[in-house]
UniProtKB/Swiss-Prot annotation:
Places the protein is found: Secreted
Expressing tissues: Expressed by the venom duct.
Primary site of residence: secreted
Protein family according to the UniProt entry: Belongs to the conotoxin I2 superfamily.
UniProt name for this protein: Conotoxin Im11.1
Disulfide bonds: C27-C41, C34-C46, C40-C50, C45-C54
Keywords, sorted A to Z: Amidation, Cleavage on pair of basic residues, Disulfide bond, Secreted, Signal, Toxin
Organism: Conus imperialis
Length: 64
């Protein structure tokens, strides 16, 4: 009986550790605050927020 209880406890501990690893590797979605490009799912941290396209202020589109 003691062996079964220990096995179940170890199994639950492994599951808890795996869930913790998955949560720490989660990426940030568009619109969430970030510090680095690698924090975002699409690897684009623009002015502190995850964004698909980073617009550069001061640049205007030229039409031809």
């Amino acid at each position: 009986m003691m062996f079964r209880l220990t096995s179940v406890s170890c199994f639950l501990l492994v599951i808890a550790c795996l869930n913790l690893v998955v949560l720490t590797n989660a990426c940030l979605r568009d619109g969430q605050s970030c510090g680095y490009d690698s924090d975002c799912c699409r690897y684009s941290c623009c002015w502190g927020y995850c964004d698909l396209t980073c617009l550069i202020n001061g640049k205007r589109a030229t039409f031809q």
